[in-house]
Amino acid sequence: MVPSFVVYSSWVNGRQRYIRQAFASILFYIIRDTTLSFPSHTTMSTKPETDLQTVLDSEIKEWHFHIYFHQNNAAEHQAALELRDAVLRLRQDGAFVAVPLFRVNMDPMGPHPVGSYEIWVPSETFASVFSYLCMNRGRLSILVHPLTREELRDHEIRNAWIGPSFPLNLANLPIKSDEIPLQYPSLKLGYSSTAHKMSLEERRKLGDDIEAVLRGEKEAARAPHRDA
Protein backbone atom coordinates (compact mmCIF):
# COMPACT_ATOMS: atom_id res chain seq x y z
CA MET A 1 0.00 0.00 0.00
CA VAL A 2 1.28 3.47 -0.87
CA PRO A 3 1.90 5.51 2.33
CA SER A 4 -0.68 8.23 2.91
CA PHE A 5 1.91 11.01 2.88
CA VAL A 6 3.03 9.87 -0.58
CA VAL A 7 -0.56 10.06 -1.79
CA TYR A 8 -0.87 13.57 -0.38
CA SER A 9 2.39 14.59 -2.01
CA SER A 10 0.96 13.56 -5.38
CA TRP A 11 -2.07 15.79 -4.83
CA VAL A 12 -0.18 19.01 -4.49
CA ASN A 13 0.75 19.54 -8.13
CA GLY A 14 -0.70 22.09 -10.55
CA ARG A 15 -4.29 23.16 -10.19
CA GLN A 16 -5.19 20.67 -7.48
CA ARG A 17 -2.51 22.14 -5.23
CA TYR A 18 -3.72 25.65 -6.00
CA ILE A 19 -7.32 24.84 -5.10
CA ARG A 20 -6.51 22.68 -2.06
CA GLN A 21 -4.35 25.38 -0.48
CA ALA A 22 -6.74 28.23 -1.21
CA PHE A 23 -8.46 28.09 2.18
CA ALA A 24 -5.20 28.14 4.14
CA SER A 25 -3.83 30.94 1.95
CA ILE A 26 -6.92 33.10 2.43
CA LEU A 27 -6.93 32.56 6.19
CA PHE A 28 -3.22 33.42 6.39
CA TYR A 29 -3.75 36.58 4.35
CA ILE A 30 -6.66 37.71 6.52
CA ILE A 31 -4.84 36.98 9.79
CA ARG A 32 -1.66 38.70 8.63
CA ASP A 33 -3.12 41.87 7.18
CA THR A 34 -6.57 42.43 8.67
CA THR A 35 -6.48 41.09 12.21
CA LEU A 36 -9.77 42.08 13.85
CA SER A 37 -8.59 42.55 17.44
CA PHE A 38 -5.29 44.20 18.29
CA PRO A 39 -3.45 44.43 21.60
CA SER A 40 -3.45 47.98 22.92
CA HIS A 41 0.21 48.57 21.99
CA THR A 42 -0.18 47.63 18.32
CA THR A 43 -1.42 49.69 15.40
CA MET A 44 -3.41 48.83 12.32
CA SER A 45 -1.28 47.17 9.67
CA THR A 46 -0.23 48.99 6.53
CA LYS A 47 -1.99 48.62 3.21
CA PRO A 48 -2.55 44.92 2.36
CA GLU A 49 0.11 43.41 0.11
CA THR A 50 -1.00 42.73 -3.48
CA ASP A 51 2.28 41.89 -5.22
CA LEU A 52 1.87 38.26 -6.27
CA GLN A 53 5.50 37.21 -5.81
CA THR A 54 5.73 38.82 -2.37
CA VAL A 55 2.52 37.14 -1.23
CA LEU A 56 3.70 33.73 -2.45
CA ASP A 57 7.13 34.10 -0.85
CA SER A 58 5.62 34.94 2.55
CA GLU A 59 2.85 32.34 2.52
CA ILE A 60 2.56 30.27 5.70
CA LYS A 61 3.04 26.56 5.09
CA GLU A 62 2.64 25.02 8.55
CA TRP A 63 0.22 25.55 11.43
CA HIS A 64 -0.43 24.51 15.02
CA PHE A 65 -3.81 23.64 16.46
CA HIS A 66 -3.73 23.63 20.28
CA ILE A 67 -6.66 21.81 21.87
CA TYR A 68 -7.43 23.21 25.33
CA PHE A 69 -9.07 21.51 28.31
CA HIS A 70 -9.37 22.40 31.99
CA GLN A 71 -7.05 19.88 33.57
CA ASN A 72 -9.26 19.45 36.65
CA ASN A 73 -12.37 18.83 34.57
CA ALA A 74 -12.53 15.09 33.96
CA ALA A 75 -15.17 15.38 31.23
CA GLU A 76 -13.16 17.95 29.26
CA HIS A 77 -9.98 15.93 29.67
CA GLN A 78 -11.70 12.81 28.36
CA ALA A 79 -13.25 14.70 25.44
CA ALA A 80 -9.86 16.14 24.49
CA LEU A 81 -8.22 12.70 24.53
CA GLU A 82 -11.04 11.21 22.45
CA LEU A 83 -10.63 13.99 19.88
CA ARG A 84 -6.88 13.35 19.75
CA ASP A 85 -7.45 9.64 19.22
CA ALA A 86 -9.97 10.37 16.45
CA VAL A 87 -7.47 12.62 14.64
CA LEU A 88 -4.85 9.86 14.80
CA ARG A 89 -7.28 7.26 13.47
CA LEU A 90 -8.38 9.49 10.60
CA ARG A 91 -4.78 10.29 9.70
CA GLN A 92 -4.12 6.57 9.55
CA ASP A 93 -7.15 6.17 7.25
CA GLY A 94 -5.88 8.92 4.92
CA ALA A 95 -8.45 11.61 5.73
CA PHE A 96 -5.74 14.23 6.21
CA VAL A 97 -2.21 14.76 7.48
CA ALA A 98 -2.18 15.97 11.09
CA VAL A 99 0.51 15.14 13.65
CA PRO A 100 -0.32 15.43 17.35
CA LEU A 101 2.75 15.86 19.51
CA PHE A 102 3.51 12.77 21.61
CA ARG A 103 2.96 14.76 24.82
CA VAL A 104 -0.32 15.88 26.39
CA ASN A 105 0.19 18.79 28.79
CA MET A 106 -1.69 18.17 32.03
CA ASP A 107 -0.74 21.59 33.38
CA PRO A 108 -0.18 25.06 31.89
CA MET A 109 2.78 24.94 29.51
CA GLY A 110 4.52 27.84 27.78
CA PRO A 111 1.91 30.37 26.63
CA HIS A 112 -0.97 27.94 27.20
CA PRO A 113 -2.87 28.66 30.46
CA VAL A 114 -4.61 25.29 30.86
CA GLY A 115 -4.14 21.67 29.86
CA SER A 116 -3.50 21.28 26.14
CA TYR A 117 -1.92 19.35 23.32
CA GLU A 118 -0.50 20.38 19.96
CA ILE A 119 -1.45 19.20 16.48
CA TRP A 120 0.87 20.12 13.60
CA VAL A 121 -0.84 20.59 10.24
CA PRO A 122 0.72 21.38 6.83
CA SER A 123 -1.00 23.81 4.50
CA GLU A 124 -1.74 20.96 2.08
CA THR A 125 -4.41 19.55 4.44
CA PHE A 126 -5.22 22.62 6.54
CA ALA A 127 -8.77 22.97 5.22
CA SER A 128 -9.61 19.32 5.93
CA VAL A 129 -8.30 19.47 9.51
CA PHE A 130 -9.92 22.85 10.19
CA SER A 131 -13.24 21.49 8.92
CA TYR A 132 -13.00 18.35 11.02
CA LEU A 133 -12.12 20.17 14.24
CA CYS A 134 -14.87 22.76 13.70
CA MET A 135 -17.40 19.98 13.39
CA ASN A 136 -16.09 17.71 16.13
CA ARG A 137 -14.56 19.87 18.88
CA GLY A 138 -17.65 19.68 21.07
CA ARG A 139 -17.23 22.35 23.77
CA LEU A 140 -13.43 22.43 23.61
CA SER A 141 -11.56 25.59 22.61
CA ILE A 142 -8.85 25.40 19.96
CA LEU A 143 -6.07 27.92 19.35
CA VAL A 144 -4.89 28.09 15.73
CA HIS A 145 -1.65 29.88 14.90
CA PRO A 146 0.90 29.86 12.07
CA LEU A 147 4.50 28.74 12.30
CA THR A 148 6.86 31.51 11.22
CA ARG A 149 10.08 33.05 12.52
CA GLU A 150 7.99 35.60 14.46
CA GLU A 151 6.67 33.39 17.25
CA LEU A 152 5.36 36.23 19.41
CA ARG A 153 3.30 37.73 16.58
CA ASP A 154 2.09 34.26 15.57
CA HIS A 155 0.54 33.78 19.01
CA GLU A 156 -0.47 37.40 19.68
CA ILE A 157 -1.97 38.91 16.52
CA ARG A 158 -1.92 36.18 13.86
CA ASN A 159 -3.89 33.67 15.88
CA ALA A 160 -7.47 32.50 15.53
CA TRP A 161 -9.80 30.60 17.81
CA ILE A 162 -12.33 27.85 17.28
CA GLY A 163 -14.56 28.31 20.30
CA PRO A 164 -14.07 30.75 23.21
CA SER A 165 -10.60 32.27 23.52
CA PHE A 166 -8.19 32.01 26.45
CA PRO A 167 -5.67 34.64 27.62
CA LEU A 168 -2.16 33.55 26.66
CA ASN A 169 1.08 34.02 28.60
CA LEU A 170 3.29 35.64 25.97
CA ALA A 171 6.07 36.84 28.27
CA ASN A 172 8.69 34.28 27.25
CA LEU A 173 8.00 33.93 23.53
CA PRO A 174 10.84 35.08 21.25
CA ILE A 175 10.15 38.06 19.04
CA LYS A 176 12.04 36.64 16.07
CA SER A 177 14.02 33.47 15.37
CA ASP A 178 16.75 32.87 12.81
CA GLU A 179 15.00 29.92 11.19
CA ILE A 180 11.42 28.92 10.42
CA PRO A 181 10.35 26.31 13.01
CA LEU A 182 9.40 23.67 10.44
CA GLN A 183 8.47 20.18 11.64
CA TYR A 184 8.42 16.61 10.29
CA PRO A 185 10.51 17.23 7.15
CA SER A 186 10.38 13.51 6.30
CA LEU A 187 6.77 14.01 5.16
CA LYS A 188 7.92 16.51 2.50
CA LEU A 189 4.93 18.72 3.19
CA GLY A 190 4.59 22.30 4.39
CA TYR A 191 7.89 24.18 4.33
CA SER A 192 9.66 20.93 3.38
CA SER A 193 7.58 20.31 0.26
CA THR A 194 9.44 19.47 -2.93
CA ALA A 195 6.31 19.58 -5.09
CA HIS A 196 6.25 21.53 -8.34
CA LYS A 197 5.48 25.21 -7.83
CA MET A 198 3.28 26.99 -10.31
CA SER A 199 4.92 29.87 -12.13
CA LEU A 200 3.54 33.38 -11.89
CA GLU A 201 2.30 33.06 -15.46
CA GLU A 202 0.49 29.80 -14.65
CA ARG A 203 -1.14 31.36 -11.62
CA ARG A 204 -2.28 34.43 -13.54
CA LYS A 205 -3.71 32.20 -16.27
CA LEU A 206 -5.58 30.18 -13.66
CA GLY A 207 -6.80 33.41 -12.08
CA ASP A 208 -8.06 34.63 -15.44
CA ASP A 209 -9.91 31.34 -15.93
CA ILE A 210 -11.58 31.71 -12.54
CA GLU A 211 -12.58 35.31 -13.28
CA ALA A 212 -14.10 34.20 -16.58
CA VAL A 213 -16.22 31.58 -14.83
CA LEU A 214 -17.33 34.01 -12.12
CA ARG A 215 -18.59 36.52 -14.67
CA GLY A 216 -21.64 34.29 -14.84
CA GLU A 217 -22.23 34.52 -11.09
CA LYS A 218 -24.31 37.57 -10.20
CA GLU A 219 -23.33 37.58 -6.52
CA ALA A 220 -19.57 37.37 -7.11
CA ALA A 221 -17.56 40.58 -6.76
CA ARG A 222 -15.46 41.52 -9.77
CA ALA A 223 -11.70 41.80 -9.48
CA PRO A 224 -10.19 45.18 -10.45
CA HIS A 225 -8.19 45.49 -13.64
CA ARG A 226 -4.72 44.02 -13.25
CA ASP A 227 -1.88 46.54 -13.13
CA ALA A 228 0.33 46.49 -16.19
Curated annotation (Swiss-Prot):
Which keywords accompany this UniProt record? Cytoplasm, Dioxygenase, Oxidoreductase
Q: Name one GO cellular component term.
A: cytoplasm
Q: Where in the cell is it found?
A: Cytoplasm
Q: In which tissues is it expressed?
A: Expressed at high level in coloured cap tissue and at least 10 times lower level in the stipe.
| Top-rank EC class of the record's enzyme | oxidoreductase
User: Key word Nuclease present in the record?
Assistant: no
Ligase: present as a keyword of the record?
A: no
Which InterPro entries does the record match to this protein? DOPA-like_sf (IPR023389), DOPA_dioxygen (IPR014980)
Q: Which GO terms describe its molecular function?
A: dioxygenase activity
Q: What is its EC number?
A: 1.14.99.-
Report the function annotation for this chain: Extradiol dioxygenase that opens up the cyclic ring of DOPA between carbons 4 and 5 thus producing an unstable seco-DOPA that rearranges non-enzymatically to betalamic acid. Can also catalyze the formation of muscaflavin (a pigment found in the hygrocybe mushrooms family and of some amanita species only) by a 2,3-extradiol cleavage of DOPA.
Q: How does it assemble?
A: Homodimer.
Q: Which PANTHER family match?
A: AFR070WP (PTHR36423:SF2)
* Protein's name according to its UniProt entry: DOPA 4,5-dioxygenase
